[in-house]
Amino acid sequence: MIFIDACFKKPTPYTPIWMMRQAGRYLPEYMEVRKQAGDFLSLCKDYKKASEVSLQPIDILDVDAAIIFSDILVVPLEMGMNLRFEKGEGPVFDNPISTLEDLEKLDDQNAHKKLNYVYDALKLTREKLSQNKALIGFCGSPWTIATYMIEGSGSKNYAKCKKMLYQNPELLHKILNKLTQVLKLYLEEQIKAGANAIQIFDSWASALEYDKFFEFSFNYMLEISNFIKSKYPNIPVILFPKGISGYLDRIDGNFDVFGVDWSTPLDLARDKLSHKYTLQGNMEPCRLYDKNAIKEGVEKILKTMQNKAHIFNLGHGILPDIPVENAKYFIKLVQESSAK
């Protein structure tokens, strides 16, 4: 698998590519399946449909890896939190956590056993996927998941989380630790079900100041990665903490790929990290609106990463109104332009 080879810094015939949110709303085929499922959460829980949409970008765009269709918040859902998705508002928890009592009500022993719909989707997808295409399993970072559990929804300033961080850091650490233990088991089950690689999404890393990022987010991601790498050394682990270009000097640990978001200069990440890790990223997703912008972005990134281990990706998820033609052009251009 070219994607796995790149994760481990092995030579590849061209730069492998996939896109975050590649199974998504920009594809009419995805919208059709989502309509059949009824709503987003029902689609996540219907393993056959989740598998179908996971495979669509492979069939339509010929990306080098599929990522399983799911959501980072199915974990707190199966721990006992009441999750719903509101149109225009995103995910909402009706019972956010603010006390130790709230936390103790959550089931961390059985949550990973209730996520069979994710494992079934992985099994089915791996069966249908051609042998040269990788299948990526994933989870959110403990910090990013915790922000939703504490705020009750998405947030602009993370005031409830940060209030807890400064007033009651012990409680926040307990929440993060509980999540970390569940996520280890969850990812292990994903690997057993057929995931060839694991990505940990830390979407809200940039909400934390320098020292607090390492204490409350990065260290927990490393604990998960250490667990996976000690048991499954052949499974690459990708970390994607978004928006922390000023923190790169302290990034170190036992993982394989570092995801670079579009706001981080790729040459900066290359100079600081490419001796240790394969880099993944980092094209600005809005470049996909225009073919000239795509071409310019692809050329610049390939030049920056010349002779370095690299997986091409966007620097965040693909947007819902990107023309499919442009996405196809992007994938093909990367694969052809980078061919050795």
From Swiss-Prot:
Coiled-coil boundaries: none
Biological process, per Gene Ontology: protoporphyrinogen IX biosynthetic process from glutamate
CDD domains: URO-D
Reaction catalysis annotation: uroporphyrinogen III + 4 H(+) = coproporphyrinogen III + 4 CO2
Feature type site, description Transition state stabilizer: D71
Pfam families (alphabetical): URO-D
GO MF annotations, alphabetized: uroporphyrinogen decarboxylase activity
Role noted for this protein: Catalyzes the decarboxylation of four acetate groups of uroporphyrinogen-III to yield coproporphyrinogen-III.
Family: Belongs to the uroporphyrinogen decarboxylase family.
Protein name: Uroporphyrinogen decarboxylase
Biological classification of the source: Bacteria, Pseudomonadati, Campylobacterota, Epsilonproteobacteria, Campylobacterales
Underlying gene: hemE
